Amino acid sequence: MFGRDKIQIKTPAQIRHMRQAGLVVADIHDALKAAIAPGVTTAQLDEVSARAIEKGKAKSNFLGYYGYPATVCTSVNEEIVHGIPGQRVLQDGDLLSCDCGAYVEADGVQWHGDAAFTAVVGNYASETDKYLDRTTERALWAAIAALAEAGVSGWKDARINLIGDAVESVVFDAAQETGHELGIVEEYVGHGIGTKMHMAPDVLNYSVSSKG
């Protein structure tokens, strides 16, 4: 999906532009989290996202992307990713994933931010849902920690697959501790970002034998 282009290396100044876009995305997340509640429609959440982007003086990199009709993806329960906002009314206990992005322009160049989060609407519907949500968050932080540790060591012998290794390790350990095994979605991957929203490298959420 994202091609086989080389990884785009950024300068410190370019990273600052990306941070500006990322801060707008963080503001979108905050606005969405404040709006999520039983009775709210996913279309209303899209309106919240659009206002946050406008307030941040940025532009949506979701709206119009390959014809996508909204500024946020709202995936509820069984919807894994890329759910389109509409008249679906959120119910207590729903698990909701919100994926959104924004870009800023500097010297005629777009710099993109893109991030997702999962929230429970009201209260968890079951202990299983709670276990899924909490384990997924633990896996996220384990992957971030693995990258941070690699950075501190100067990226010596570091490989992109350490992210998938960290995620799968958390999922495996959780299954060993509780006896409840969770699956990892392999049909979708993470991605690089920069002057485009989707760039190299593809980032797998599971362990692979090859290094890279």
Task: Describe each PLM feature range.
Residues M1-G212:
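Active-site neighborhoods and metal-handling regions in enzymes and metal-associated proteins
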